[in-house]
């Protein structure tokens, strides 16, 4: 019984790790694309996330339709650079010329 529980736990952990959008394809890329440096990363449910998006010039963006973390004012990190004075993230989608990144997960480049 104990060994079955351990096998189930290990399988669940492995599927969680495989589904995480962590950096997997080299020092500055994620499974979803390049690592980005975002000046601000907020969860979409934070009260000020909508005002941050509007302050970035994204008046037409409906924050309520987004899920997860939202990165604002993002730029991809170059192949040989790990310089980011803000938050490094892997994101599902980057739109509005880098103004908004959705589905973002923070990453630590020092451990990649």
Curated annotation (Swiss-Prot):
Localization per record: Secreted; Secreted, Cell wall
GO cellular component terms attached to this protein's record: extracellular region; fungal-type cell wall
Signal sequence residues: 1-19
Protein's UniProt keywords contain Ribosomal protein: no
Keywords: Cell wall, Disulfide bond, Glycoprotein, Secreted, Signal
Glycan attachment positions: 108
Pfam families the record matches: Hydrophobin (PF01185)
Disulfide bonds: 30-90, 37-84, 38-74, 91-104
GO molecular function: structural constituent of cell wall
Subunit structure: Self-assembles to form functional amyloid fibrils called rodlets. Self-assembly into fibrillar rodlets occurs spontaneously at hydrophobic:hydrophilic interfaces and the rodlets further associate laterally to form amphipathic monolayers.
Role summary: Aerial growth, conidiation, and dispersal of filamentous fungi in the environment rely upon a capability of their secreting small amphipathic proteins called hydrophobins (HPBs) with low sequence identity. Class I can self-assemble into an outermost layer of rodlet bundles on aerial cell surfaces, conferring cellular hydrophobicity that supports fungal growth, development and dispersal; whereas Class II form highly ordered films at water-air interfaces through intermolecular interactions but contribute nothing to the rodlet structure.
UniProt family annotation: Belongs to the fungal hydrophobin family.
Protein name per the record: Class I hydrophobin 17
């Amino acid at each position: 019984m104990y060994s079955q529980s351990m096998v189930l736990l290990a399988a669940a952990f492995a599927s969680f790790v495989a589904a995480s959008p962590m950096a997997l394809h080299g020092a500055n890329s994620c499974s979803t694309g390049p690592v980005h440096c975002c000046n601000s990363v907020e969860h979409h449910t934070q009260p000020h996330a909508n005002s941050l998006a509007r302050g970035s010039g994204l008046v037409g963006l409906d924050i309520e339709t987004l899920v997860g973390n939202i990165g604002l004012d993002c730029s991809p990190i170059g192949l040989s650079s790990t310089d980011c004075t803000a938050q490094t993230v892997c994101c599902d989608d980057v739109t509005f010329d880098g103004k908004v990144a959705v589905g973002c997960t923070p990453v630590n480049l020092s451990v990649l």
